Amino acid sequence: MLVHPQFNPIALDLGFFQIHWYGLTYLAAFGLFYFLATRRIRQAPYASGSGPAWTARDVEDLLFFGVVGVILGGRLGYVLFYKPTYYLANLSEIPAVWKGGMAFHGGLLGVIVAMALFAHLRGRKFFEVTDLVAPCVPTGLAMGRIGNFINGELWGRAADASLPWAMVFPQSGSDLPRHPSQLYQFALEGLALFALTWFYGHSRSAHVGADGRPIWGRVSGLFVGGYGVFRFIAEYFREPDSFLGLLAFNLSMGQWLCVPMIVAGALIWWSAGRRRV
């Protein structure tokens, strides 16, 4: 059995300015997105597309839109999905993102709106944009889970002490051995989802239909559905939010939010080959 090392959340303290590890993981996430996206636009189908050529400047603008979507959507998602009653009574607390409280599912909705706006302003197809973005996101999710682990937050459910990697999280207020669910999510939502979407996104079947015409949306559908499946699995090992607990059928809020993602992902993938570009 292991004990969480309780890392110092501050990576660098200059006295007048502090740099937190969690902030560095966000910086790494944005850097990885830029690196992967600029590489992806130089490869098929983007390098050989019939529409306007993609440039590094486009990726920079896309990243800006995405960051705004993540912050606004992530915060509003947490407010609406997890603590609507509290924030309805404390409206001034809604903008206080520095106090914590972000939701992935809300962030995803925010990014979808941001990508739709970007596509409209640039005269591009919506799924052309999201198919570019989708494989570049999981590495950022992986960095976020590393940040959660460093902070010793979002720990897992109680585990059998005989499990070699069972870990005590002192921040939980108990000495129960727990699943290091942050690392499970790092592996599933980060590494596995990245491998799945990146390699599929470079395959011919992802962008060319059976009749040889170009298609968009399959990579996006795989990302949405794949994340839903991986997160649904990981939630069985993650401690439910104390203020919510388990809901109907002993599923967590995270799992219930993943159900429509799985359905939507499957529908997006299935319908992609039936839309004419």
Swiss-Prot record:
A 1,2-diacyl-sn-glycero-3-phospho-(1'-sn-glycerol) binds at residue 145. InterPro entries: Lgt. It is an enzyme of class 2 (transferase). Pfam families: LGT. One of its GO terms (molecular function) is phosphatidylglycerol-prolipoprotein diacylglyceryl transferase activity. It is a multi-pass membrane protein. The chain crosses the membrane at residues 16-36, 62-82, 101-121, 214-234, 243-263. One of its GO terms (cellular component) is plasma membrane. Keywords: Cell inner membrane, Cell membrane, Membrane, Transferase, Transmembrane, Transmembrane helix. Pathway: Protein modification; lipoprotein biosynthesis (diacylglyceryl transfer). It is found in: Cell inner membrane. Its EC number is 2.5.1.145. One of its GO terms (biological process) is lipoprotein biosynthetic process. HAMAP family: Lgt (MF_01147). Belongs to the Lgt family. Catalyzes the transfer of the diacylglyceryl group from phosphatidylglycerol to the sulfhydryl group of the N-terminal cysteine of a prolipoprotein, the first step in the formation of mature lipoproteins. This is Phosphatidylglycerol--prolipoprotein diacylglyceryl transferase. It comes from Leptothrix cholodnii (strain ATCC 51168 / LMG 8142 / SP-6) (Leptothrix discophora (strain SP-6)). The lineage of its organism: Bacteria, Pseudomonadati, Pseudomonadota, Betaproteobacteria, Burkholderiales. The gene is lgt.
